[in-house]
C-alpha cells in the first residue's frame, strides 16, 4: 500500500550550494531535502541552470511539426508491431480513446557497439529519431538536454545522500553516464473540443492518469503552467502547486526500497484538465548492473529488511507492473 504523506507543502529549494565547496551550505540544503522528502515527498529545485524557455520552444515545435506518418513510424511496439522498441519511441494518441501523446528517449550513450546493446539486454535501446532534415534541432537539443538533466539529477542526489547520512558521492557510481537507464518523456496533453472518455478516481475526480508511484530513483519534472498534479496525504488528495521556472522533484520506489521508506515514493495522480500543456519528466535510473544495498538511514530506527536487487531487475519489473496497473501510456 502507498504511504500517505503527512503534508501537501511543496517547498522551493535552492540547490546551487550542492555544486559548491561550502560544506555547511550543502548540509543546509540536505536538511531541506530531508524535510520535503518526508513531508509531501515533493520539492521544487531552483537555480538549476536549465533554459526552460528553450525546452518549451523545442518540444512545442516538435509536437506541432510531427506528421501522423512520422508518429506511426516512430511508435513503440504497443502501437506499431514493426518496431521492436518498448521504451524509446512515440506513444500515440488514439482518436476517441486516448488524447495524450508523447515521445520517450533513452541514454544517447546507447549505440550499436555498447555492451548492453550488443548483448540485447532488456531496457536498453538505441534511440530512434525523427527525420533530422525536417526536425534539425530536435535531436541535438534532446541529447544535450539529457546530459544536462543527468548532471542536475546527480547533483540533487548528492543532497539526498547527505540527508541520509552518507557521503555526498554515495550515488555517483550508480549514475555513470555510460550506463544509466534514465529516460526523458516529452508528454503533450492537448486541448480538444471533444475529449475521449477519461477515468474517474474513487473520490469522483476526473483523471488524465491514475494514482501511481514513480518507477525511478528520483523524478525531475518540468511542466507548463496548468496545475494538474495531486499527492495523496493523510488528509486525502491535495493539489501540488505549479511553477513556471523550477523542476519538481520526488523519490521513486527504488529510493523507498533502499531506505526502507524513510524517503518514500509519494502516491500521486494527474487531474483531467482540458488544456494544452506539456509534462516533461526525467526519470533518473541507475545502470543495469548497479546494486545499492538497502540500509537504515542515519537517525532512523529499525533494521535492514528489504532484499538486494539489481537496478535492471527492479526497473524491468516496475515498468511492467505500472503498465498492468494503469495501462499503456
Swiss-Prot record:
Gene3D superfamilies: B-lactam Antibiotic, Isopenicillin N Synthase, Chain (2.60.120.330)
One matching Pfam family: 2OG-FeII_Oxy
GO biological process per UniProt: antibiotic biosynthetic process
Recorded GO MF terms: iron ion binding; isopenicillin-N synthase activity; L-ascorbic acid binding
Class in the EC hierarchy, top level: oxidoreductase
Residues bound to 2-oxoglutarate: 277
Sequence positions that bind isopenicillin N: 87, 91, 183, 189, 279
SUPFAM superfamilies according to UniProt: Clavaminate synthase-like
Binding site for Fe(2+): 212, 214, 268
Domain Fe2OG dioxygenase, first and last residues per copy: 180-286
Cofactor(s) required, per the database record: Fe cation; L-ascorbate
Pathway assigned in UniProt: Antibiotic biosynthesis; penicillin G biosynthesis; penicillin G from L-alpha-aminoadipate and L-cysteine and L-valine: step 2/3
EC number assigned by the record: 1.21.3.1
Protein name: Isopenicillin N synthase
Lineage: Bacteria, Bacillati, Actinomycetota, Actinomycetes, Kitasatosporales
Amino acid at each position: 500500500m502507498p504511504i500517505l504523506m503527512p503534508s501537501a507543502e511543496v517547498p522551493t529549494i535552492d540547490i546551487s550550494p550542492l555544486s559548491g565547496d561550502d560544506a555547511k551550505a550543502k548540509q543546509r540544503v540536505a536538511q531541506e531535502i530531508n524535510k520535503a522528502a518526508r513531508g509531501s515527498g515533493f520539492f521544487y529545485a531552483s537555480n538549476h541552470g536549465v533554459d526552460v524557455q528553450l525546452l518549451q520552444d523545442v518540444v512545442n515545435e516538435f509536437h506541432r511539426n510531427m506528421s501522423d506518418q512520422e508518429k506511426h513510424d516512430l511508435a513503440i511496439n504497443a502501437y506499431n508491431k514493426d518496431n521492436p522498441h518498448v521504451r524509446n519511441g512515440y506513444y500515440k494518441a488514439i482518436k476517441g480513446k486516448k488524447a495524450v501523446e508523447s515521445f520517450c528517449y533513452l541514454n544517447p550513450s546507447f549505440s550499436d557497439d555498447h555492451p548492453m546493446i550488443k548483448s540485447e539486454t532488456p531496457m536498453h535501446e538505441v534511440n530512434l529519431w525523427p527525420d533530422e532534415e525536417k526536425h534539425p534541432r530536435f535531436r541535438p537539443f534532446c541529447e544535450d538536454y539529457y546530459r544536462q538533466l543527468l548532471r542536475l539529477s546527480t547533483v540533487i542526489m548528492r543532497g539526498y545522500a547527505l540527508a541520509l547520512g552518507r557521503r555526498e558521492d554515495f550515488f555517483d557510481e550508480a549514475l555513470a553516464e555510460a550506463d544509466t537507464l534514465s529516460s526523458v518523456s516529452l508528454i503533450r496533453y492537448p486541448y480538444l473540443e471533444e475529449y475521449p472518455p477519461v477515468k474517474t478516481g474513487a473520490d469522483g475526480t476526473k483523471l488524465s492518469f491514475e494514482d501511481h508511484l514513480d518507477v525511478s530513483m528520483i523524478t525531475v519534472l518540468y511542466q507548463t503552467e496548468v496545475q494538474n498534479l495531486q499527492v495523496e496525504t493523510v488528509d486525502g488528495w491535495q493539489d501540488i502547486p505549479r511553477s513556471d521556472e523550477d523542476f519538481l522533484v520526488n523519490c521513486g520506489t527504488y529510493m523507498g526500497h533502499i531506505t526502507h521508506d524513510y524517503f518514500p515514493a509519494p502516491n500521486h495522480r494527474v487531474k483531467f484538465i482540458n488544456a494544452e500543456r506539456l509534462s516533461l519528466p526525467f526519470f533518473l535510473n541507475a545502470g543495469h548492473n548497479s546494486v545499492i544495498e538497502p540500509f537504515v538511514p542515519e537517525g532512523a530506527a529499525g533494521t535492514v529488511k528489504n532484499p538486494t536487487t539489481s537496478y535492471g531487475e527492479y526497473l524491468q519489473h516496475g515498468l511492467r507492473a505500472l503498465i498492468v496497473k494503469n495501462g499503456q501510456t
